[in-house]
Amino acid sequence: GFGFPLSVALALLGIAFGLHAGSAAAEPNFILILADDLGWTSLSKTMDMTKPGARSDFYQTPHLQGMADRGMVFSDAYAPAPVCTPSRNAMLHGMTPARMLNSTLNTDRSSKEYRGKITIPQALKLANPEYVAAHFGKWHIPAMKPSDAGYDFTEKEKGTGNGEGDYLDDMRTHLPGDDPKRLFSLTQMTKDFISEQANAEQPFFVQLSHYSVHIWHDSLKETREKYRALPRPLKAVDSDYLPDDEIPDFKHNWLLNYAAMIEDTDRAFGDLLDHIEALGIDDNTYVIFTSDNGGGLRGNAPLQGAKGDLTEGGIRIPLVVCGPGVLEGQYCSVPTAGWDWLPTFYQLAGGTAPLPKELDGVSIADTFTLGDKATVERPGDALIFHFPWYNGEPESSIRRGDFKLLKNLDTQAVALYKLSEDLSEKHDLKSSYPEMAASLEQQMMEYLDSVGAEDVNQLRAGFLKNIEGEWLTKAEARADSNRAAAAAGNAQAQQQLAEAEKYIKWLKQEAIFTRERMAMSEGNN
C-alpha cells in the first residue's frame, strides 16, 4: 500500500507537538475534502434539481452520489475566488480575498498583514484545545506554512504547490501510474491520521486537498478504458478516442482522461468514507466535499464562464455535506461561500468566545438541520467577490438574494442578472431594474473601499516591475549563457536558447498588453 505510520512521517518532519489523548470525544470531527478546479456540473449527482443540466451525463461519481443521498447538497455554494491561492487563503481565514489583500495570485501584502488573525485549526482549538488538525495535499498558500496556520500534522513542512501533484520529489519524474495525482497515497495518509485520532479518542479536523482535477490530468488506465467503452457524450471529439499510446502523457484536454480522473477522485473518496464507517465514527463526523474554484473541461453549461472568471462558471462550486443531524437527501439553496467554514465549524465544535471582528464568514450550521428554513444572518445579506486580475479581465461582483451584479473594473461597465431565472447570465437586466443595479453597485463598492481592496492598476504596476526587472533579466541571462554553444551546434543549448527567447518574447508582449490595459483603465476611471 501507499501508507506509512503517521508517527514516522512526523518524526521525519520534526513537527510532533506533544499531543495527548483526551477522554472519549463528544466533540464532532471534521473532514474537509477540497477538489481542485472541479466544476459545478462535473458530478453525476445533480447540484440543483430545478436547473436542467446541473450534472454530468458522462462522468460517474457514485460515492459522492451516495454521500449526497445521505446528506445535503448546497445548490448555491461559491468559492471565495475563481483561482486557487486566494480561495484557499480565504477559506482558511474566514475572510474574503478582498479583505485579505489576496484577491489574485500575489500574496505579498496578505502574508505581512493577515498572519495571526485566526484560522480554522486555531478556531477549533479555541473552541476546545483537544482538537488535532492535519492538512494533506495541495497547500498553495505561499504566505504561510501549515504549522503557522495551526496544523499539527502535514506531509511537507513548507506546504506544497501544483508540482507535487504531477511529479516525485525531484520534480522531474512523473508519479507512478497506480497513484495518479497522488489520489490514493494522500487518501491513505488521511486514513492513517484519522485512525490514530479515533484510537486516541481525540477530536480532529483534517483537510485533504486533492491535486485533481487540476492540470496536468492523469488517471488509472483501467478507468480510462471504462470511459472509452461508454456511449460517446456531446462534449467528445474524435481525438478523444485515439489509442493511449498516440496521446501525449498527461494531456490536459483529453476527455477520457479527465472523466477517468474525476472517477478516480471519487473512488479515493469512497475509500475514505468506508474507512470512517469501519472505525464507527461516522455518526460524529462531518464530511464536506467541495472545490476551490470553478472548472470544467470544454465549458460549464448551463453556467457561463470557467476558472479565472467571476461568472457563475468560475465561482459556483459543488458542495455536499453529511454528518450528525444533517438532513438526508435534501437540497439547500441558501447562498454560502468558502469563508463561512471557519465560523460554521467553530459553532459546531461548541465555541462560545467571540471570534475576531474582521471575519466575513457566518455560520451556516443551522442549514444542516433546517435546510432552506434556516435563517442565516449575513452583514448586508450579500456575498461580495473581488478579482482585480492584472493579466486579464478584472472584475468585482455581488450576489444579494436572486440578483447578481458584475462590474468590469477596467471599463466600469456593469451587468445585472436574476439567477433564479437566468443561471447562464445571458440577459442583462440593469435597464429593467436600475434601482437594484445602483443599490448593489453602491453596496459592493462601499465594502471594497472599507477593506482597502486591491486596485487592479496597482497590481499591474507590480506585475510590470517583475516582468521588466527580475524576470526579464534572468531570461536574458539564460539566453546569453546558451548562445555560444548553440551557435557551435550544441542541440541542447539550441533548445534552451529557443525556450529562453520564446519566454523573452512573451514577457515583452505581456508588458505591452499590461501598459495598454492600464491606460485604458485609467481613462475610464
What spans do the regions from the language model cover?
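Formylglycine-dependent sulfatase
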Residues: 21-409, 414, 423-442, 446, ...
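Acidic/polar, glycine-enriched structural segments that form the non-catalytic walls/loops
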Residues: 449
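Short, flexible loop/turn segments with low-complexity composition
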Residues: 357-358, 452-464
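Bacterial N-terminal signal peptides
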Residues: 7-18
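N-terminal secretory signal peptides that target proteins for export/translocation
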Residues: 1-4
